[in-house]
């Protein structure tokens, strides 16, 4: 037993320096929504700490990024995961099974799942029920036969349902299902009963998206969605609020339940698609790569994520004061998240 403990300690001591020997640059993967914020932080960080190199930021989507992040410890694996939703219990289990046992969770701000369209489009307001009936593969368990928005709601125009949105690897796709589609689905008495008896089937019916061409996966590239909307009147795009904010000359936001996606409505959570954004730090890499601490410190500065921070100019919505204080403490202490608290 003593030999095994000594051997394990030796492996740990050898493996961590090996990361630094192989690379000194920090590497982050994950959310396309968090990407522009992480990129801006990386640029500031590189100017402040030129000897540490410019952090490498990759836009892979939250789900795909989690798989890479949780695949192991060592120079081949990312140091940080950017996420547009919280880590799932299944992802924490994957991390733990691959030796990634200590991860720090840091909320960096807020964003909203925005519905955008060309400024020339007649659509201006949708309810969550409208969106569910238009996009669900089997709304309330029945095949989706709706071809136009008027089929969904007689008060809407008779234009074809054509929505550009994120793929299954995206945290924005998860948020679409959880925040926008599930509430009107669960409001149905039959679906509420199903949730108690068969949660997996309930989730499939409430969050499953149609595959007949009405919903088009646009990849992990919100800028591509912006281009599609500008070129195709009467289509709708699902993207992060920051991308809508940056393209207000071309696009307009669609109200959901009568609430426009704005800084104020997301900050107050009165907008149904408001959600927190996170970064996850692989603690086992921190000692070997000083650039990780420098990046995390820059990302959580009040001058970055506060109400007057430079990331607000990029479309980030500042989290409440108490949340920012917790995030700044987490960045300093790097206390690991309790995997058991994740769902």
Task: List each language-model region with its residue ranges.
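Bacterial N-terminal signal peptides that target proteins for export
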Residues: 1-7
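Bacterial N-terminal signal peptides
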Residues: 7-15
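Sec/Tat signal peptide C-region and signal peptidase I cleavage site
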Residues: 16-22
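Flexible loop/hinge segments at secondary-structure junctions
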Residues: 22-343
């Amino acid at each position: 037993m003593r030999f095994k403990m000594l051997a394990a300690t030796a492996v740990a001591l050898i493996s961590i320096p090996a990361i630094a020997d192989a690379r000194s640059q920090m590497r982050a993967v994950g959310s396309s929504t968090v990407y522009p914020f992480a990129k801006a932080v990386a640029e500031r960080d590189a100017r402040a700490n030129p000897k540490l190199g410019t952090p490498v930021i990759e836009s892979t989507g939250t789900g795909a990024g989690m798989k890479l992040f949780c695949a192991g410890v060592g120079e081949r694996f990312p140091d940080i995961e950017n996420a547009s939703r919280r880590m799932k219990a299944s992802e924490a289990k994957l991390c733990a099974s691959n030796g990634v046992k200590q991860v720090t969770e840091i909320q960096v701000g807020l964003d909203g799942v925005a519905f955008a369209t060309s400024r020339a489009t007649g659509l201006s307001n949708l309810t969550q029920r409208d969106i569910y009936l238009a996009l669900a593969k089997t709304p309330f368990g029945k095949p989706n036969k709706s071809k136009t928005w008027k089929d969904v709601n007689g008060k809407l125009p008779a234009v074809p349902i054509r929505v550009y949105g994120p793929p299954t690897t995206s945290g924005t796709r998860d948020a679409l299902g959880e925040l926008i589609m599930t509430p009107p689905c669960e409001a149905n008495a039959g679906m509420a009963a199903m949730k108690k008896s068969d949660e997996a089937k309930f989730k499939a019916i409430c969050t499953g998206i149609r595959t007949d061409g009405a919903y088009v996966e646009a990849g992990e590239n919100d800028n591509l969605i912006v281009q599609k909307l500008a070129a195709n009147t009467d289509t709708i795009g699902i993207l992060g609020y920051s991308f809508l904010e940056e393209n207000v000359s071309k696009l307009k936001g669609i109200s959901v339940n009568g609430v426009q996606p704005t800084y104020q409505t997301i900050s107050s959570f009165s907008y149904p698609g408001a959600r927190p954004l996170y970064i996850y730090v692989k603690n086992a890499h921190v000692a070997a790569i000083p650039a990780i601490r420098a990046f995390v410190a820059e990302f959580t500065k009040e001058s970055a994520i506060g109400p007057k921070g430079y990331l607000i100019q990029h479309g980030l919505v500042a989290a409440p004061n108490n949340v920012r204080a917790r995030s700044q403490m987490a960045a300093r202490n790097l206390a690991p998240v309790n995997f058991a608290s994740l769902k």
